[in-house]
Regions:
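Active-site nucleophile-adjacent alpha helix/oxyanion-hole segment immediately C-terminal to the catalytic cysteine
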Residues: 1-42, 48, 53, 57-60, ...
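Extracellular and analogous surface-interaction loops
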Residues: 21, 68-72, 136
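Conserved active-site-adjacent core of cysteine acyl-enzyme catalytic domains
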Residues: 33-93, 98-126
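Charged phosphate-binding loop/patch that engages nucleotide di/tri-phosphates or the phosphate backbone
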Residues: 124-140
Length: 140
């Protein structure tokens, strides 16, 4: 899976969905905007519903939020909430994608300022919870 760099300061949710959907940021941004989802809307990084709505547009199923127990307990494909904190009593976080494939695990982090968007520095990331995601197969 390939990383997608967020083109807006607060577009990590959109970029994470773009990576999962195999599309680029601008296309995911257009889809999000058509659904009434915008990167500067605080709900995008303080609620899961906007990301869930965008995932549904791309036929990607999302499970419930599950507190992180360990990296090894994560499903093979998941959204993670890192940099979780509270501001004024409201939770905020940075969306990233966890991938386990071909005997390798990594995190796709869309933050533009990073030197690499494929991360394996698991000790530095502190996920609060994960959401299992999977592509819905078309019926044929």
């Amino acid at each position: 899976m390939k990383p997608v760099v967020q083109l807006e300061r607060t577009g990590c949710g959109i970029a994470s969905v773009a990576a999962l959907a195999g599309t680029n940021y601008r296309q995911a941004q257009r889809s999000a905007n058509q659904l009434g989802i915008f990167a500067d809307d605080r709900r995008l990084w303080s609620e899961t519903q906007p990301v869930r709505t965008l995932l549904k547009r791309y036929r990607i199923r999302a499970g419930t939020e599950i507190p992180l127990v360990s990296w090894s307990a994560l499903p093979d494909l998941a959204l993670l909430a890192i940099k979780w904190h509270r501001e004024g009593g409201r939770a905020f976080w940075h969306w990233v994608v966890f991938v386990r494939e071909h005997d390798r695990s990594y995190v796709l982090d869309s933050k533009r300022a990073l030197n690499t968007h494929v991360r394996t520095d698991f000790g530095r990331m502190r996920p609060k919870w994960s959401i299992r995601v999977e592509k819905i197969r078309s019926r044929r």
